[in-house]
Amino acid sequence: MVLEQYFLLLPEFNLNTIRVSNNPSGSAAKPLFMYNRDGSICYYKSTKQVDFVRTFGIHKVTFMKHLEQGTYYLNKYLFSMEELPNAEQSDMTVEQVATMLDIDRVTNNKNKTLVSFSVAVTLINIETKEEHKFPSLGTAVKFLKNGSYPADQRTLVKRINTNIPYHGFTCHKY
């Protein structure tokens, strides 16, 4: 306690000397860019991450993941800290880019499974070699039940990639 009082009362000691990394004001920040998948069009650039988060509704964790790993956001957009020399600046407004992202989110989310741990499977008929692809085990079980088979999801899980027949089908992840 005495040490705290000493530092608080000492006039030349400054407690506000913390340097903020990635300064949110953008004064010392590196520029960030949003390109199309092949990097030929630059849709947006800013020195602040918060602009991408607030303006376009991209979650900060999602933004950082795609920025750091170099993966494509919505399988279409590339975030980068480097300016690509051959990229042309888009003439779209910020509102148009935000609308484009909203439309792509709806389209992309329709193609996703509802549960992140869902397993996409293929059932292959042993006799005809006909393949039936399903986005989840549940839909594969419904298919088997509609074919008058007493199907069970637990048993189907055990048969994935084992080549053990289940009601005339083999089950594989895809």
From Swiss-Prot:
One of its GO terms (molecular function) is endonuclease activity. Its EC number is 3.1.-.-. It is found in: Mitochondrion. InterPro entries: Intron_nuc_1_rpt. Keywords: Endonuclease, Hydrolase, Intron homing, Mitochondrion, Nuclease. GO terms for biological process: intron homing. The keyword Hydrolase applies. Its main location: mitochondrion. Mitochondrial DNA endonuclease involved in intron homing. Encoded within intron 3 of COX1. This is Probable intron-encoded DNA endonuclease aI3.
